[in-house]
Amino acid sequence: MSASESHDTAYDSLTEDHGADGQWAFGTGIEDVAAEITSPVPDGVDPADLAQYCLMLGDDALICSHRLSEWTTNAPELEEEVALANIALDLLGQARLLLARAGHVEQAGRDEDALAYLRPELEFRNVAMAEIGDELDFARAVARLLLFSTWRLALLQRLLTSRDPVIAAVAGKGVKEVAYHRDYAARWALRLGDGTAESHRRMQAALDGVWPYVEELFRTSEVEVALTAAGVAVDPAQIRAEVDSVLDEVFAAATLTRPQRPGIGTIAGRGGRQGLHTEKLGHVLAVMQGLARQHPGATW
Amino acid sequence: MVNGAAPAAVRAQAAVAAVVDPEMPMLTLDDLGVVRGVEVRAGGEAVRVTITPTYSGCPAIEVMRDDLRTALAEAGFAAVEVRTVLSPPWSTDWISAAGRRKLAEHGIAPPAGVGPRSSGPVPLALSAPVDVVRCPHCGSAATDELSRFGPTACTALRRCTACREPFEHVKEI
């Protein structure tokens, strides 16, 4: 069966031989992601900075997506498994576009797959909140997703007017998607927080557990400073008040207490945006990149 | 079947119009509102179709590309290019009136209107939307949302409390 024939279901294409056209990201038959990817770098913007910024936004989505996908076959209810898988898929779609854009503007011959599957840990630019994972604790998944998606939604909202056409387009689709993710997490936070004594205790404990990773979300990197001035990026420090007010609304309704816990801090001012990660990212990459590294060039 | 008599632009439009969505095959891609343009080039030998994805990660777009290429090759075009563009983002408001009718006939509740996006922050929704979604089986307005996320990226799961049937609802974006 050739790739040009139609399929009865979306899964039939998985069984075909795609020769040199196969790719890793979604499996077989995946092609160039969108026409906008090859748009020129906006005037006055350093391509290296733009590539780094696309990696920041893309790695946040990719690594968070991978962590959410760990719930597949492990969620407490089928509906929640489907929901978390759907959210992971939306974020993977955003990641593909941003990594493809990073690969295009850095001009080092790396496509989205090379960036996702062959990049070493020190080159990942995601925040720790994306990588720490849920340890199969559903309340922790709710807490992490609430914090991550409330923050990402505020970022994407401001990126709608980014001078980079790919970032603006990803934001245009992403705002709609991430608003659903945030509301999903907020409703579960409400249900668990304002539920039984046991569900309240576990929801509060989960929130306390991930809170040290909040501070990093609002720390501005040098790349973000330069690109905010150029009209491409958002200074994350500027969205803190908006994020806090949304979180306070959820906490109040859910009878949860805003944790008073110090952030994880930096090492000589460096964190995830500079490639310094917790040991958890190594675990993620070992799983996510293992197959691609053991079978270089393999496609399916 | 190659029909050399009809003008190329008409043949191309007709071929594209017949391609259906892989996950909701009661809808054509036209009904779904993902076809953004059909251009015939090179004196009628080549055609370029522009489509837009529904959700960022929707894997169905790959099957759509395949099916468009096949349909246009069968319509006699030697060179077929299928482009994907992201902007402006797809909205369920682009689903045609015929598409909405077909969804309901197949037991899937069509989306309500979204309208233009407001520019401020997206308000938090701590409870399921109260919009009336009618049961596509019995027409009752007494339906509940079971899950915001359904079997495909674009649908939610609901249940009718009158006839007790579960059904999918194309959620508004």
Each language-model region and where it sits:
Chain B
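Residue-level signature of catalytic and energy-coupling elements of molecular machines
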Residues: 16, 35, 58, 80
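A short amphipathic beta-strand at an alpha->beta junction
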Residues: 70-94
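Short, non-transmembrane amphipathic alpha-helical segments
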Residues: 54-79
